[in-house]
């Protein structure tokens, strides 16, 4: 839906269409010149004159316009990849907001029960003021976080609705570790992946345009042609003698050399820009792949040990509190730590998935 309703993609599509129309314009010739002139001083005669560039100029202009259309197409691919990345990121953040909201809701319900129990025990003289106040304070903190998380969930849905252009209530899938066609055994740059990216293709196409521009400027060195019709004498002048033919002579050759040199300089600029773009793309790729590897290893630890230890910590603290070996302060502190571990896991899943989204964007998926 986001791809269908995107104004950016529509604009990119219209730019491609505009460039295709410019391909037709590349072979247009100048308007003819109509002449009304008295060549003999006795009568007025009508003439017409038409100028043409050397045929190679039109061919090169056509080729340059075609390459510009390809560049616009490459730009639209980048726009599409960027839009996909934005929507995926917004969707991922929404998934995280919902997962965290559920965690806060569970913690809020539990801490509410403990806060009320602490109030009753304080009134019964079973605990002191510090324990009761600490239980109330922790519940207030958690409840505030829970209310805030509800706002985040609503904001996430509005963001997705904005991207998709729908007003219907929608709900995302569960937040889970993503999968991608990437190898995380090392962080060596994948040259095949880099070489096939829309971003690099855009830079390479810019070089091709500069090369075609040089060819066009060189073709302008060739002479232009002029043909026309005008009666230069009396009314009985034979028709063949009324025709005129002209040929422009590229006498001021240094002017063409300047234009060619400028086009060659632009090609060098395009090549440097392409090299800089590749360098930046490689750096972004390495950074995203390093992040993915880092979060991948962290998730393996949490799924193998961290989450299980958090659950064991919660169960042990429940037993200790029920047996009277933990007071409210120690019990609530332990529960808070256990819930925090679970939220850290959710954030790791988000960070790992975000690294995959970045890698997908860089290769145009």
What do these predicted regions represent?
Residues 1-93, 100, 105, 129, ...:
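Short flexible linkers and secondary-structure junctions
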Residues 1-54, 192-261, 265-271, 283, ...:
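A small-residue-enriched
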Residues 54-55, 121-124, 253, 320:
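Glycine-centered coil turns and helix-coil junctions that link the paired helices
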Residues 82-198, 288-291, 295:
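Periplasmic alpha-helical coiled-coil/stalk elements that build and connect Gram-negative outer-membrane
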Residues 125, 165-166, 223, 324, ...:
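Short helix-capping/hinge motifs at transmembrane helix termini and TM-loop junctions
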């Amino acid at each position: 839906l986001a791809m269908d309703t995107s104004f950016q993609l529509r604009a990119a599509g219209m730019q491609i269409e505009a460039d295709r129309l410019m391909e037709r314009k590349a072979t247009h010739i100048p308007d003819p010149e109509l002449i009304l002139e008295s060549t003999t001083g006795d009568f007025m005669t009508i003439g017409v004159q038409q100028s043409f560039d050397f045929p190679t100029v039109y061919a090169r202009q056509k080729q340059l316009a075609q390459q510009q259309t390809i560049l616009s197409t490459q730009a639209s691919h980048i726009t599409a990849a960027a839009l996909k990345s934005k929507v995926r990121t917004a969707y991922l953040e929404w998934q995280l907001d919902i997962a965290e909201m559920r965690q806060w809701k569970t913690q809020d319900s539990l801490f509410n029960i403990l806060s009320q129990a602490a109030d009753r025990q304080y009134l019964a003289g079973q605990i002191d003021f510090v324990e009761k106040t600490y239980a109330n304070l922790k519940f207030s903190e958690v409840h505030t976080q829970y209310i805030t998380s509800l706002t985040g969930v609503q904001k996430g849905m509005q963001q997705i609705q904005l991207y998709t252009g729908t007003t219907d209530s929608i709900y995302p899938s569960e937040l889970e570790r993503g999968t991608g066609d990437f190898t995380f055994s090392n962080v060596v740059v994948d040259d095949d992946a880099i070489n096939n990216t829309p971003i690099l293709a855009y830079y390479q196409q810019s070089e091709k345009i500069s090369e075609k521009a040089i060819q066009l400027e060189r073709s302008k060195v060739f002479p232009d042609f002029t043909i026309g019709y005008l009666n230069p004498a009396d009314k009985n002048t034979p028709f063949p003698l009324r025709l005129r033919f002209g040929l422009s002579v590229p006498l001021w050759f240094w002017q063409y050399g300047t234009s060619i040199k400028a086009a060659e300089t632009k090609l060098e600029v395009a090549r440097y820009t392409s090299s800089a773009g590749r360098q930046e793309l490689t750096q972004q790729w390495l950074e995203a792949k390093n992040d993915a590897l880092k979060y991948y290893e962290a998730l393996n630890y949490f799924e193998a040990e961290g989450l299980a230890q958090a659950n064991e910590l919660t169960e042990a603290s429940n037993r200790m509190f029920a047996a009277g070996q933990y007071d409210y302060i120690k019990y609530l502190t332990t529960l808070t730590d256990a819930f925090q571990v679970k939220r850290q896991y959710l954030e790791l899943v988000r960070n790992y998935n975000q690294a995959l989204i970045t890698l997908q964007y860089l290769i145009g998926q």
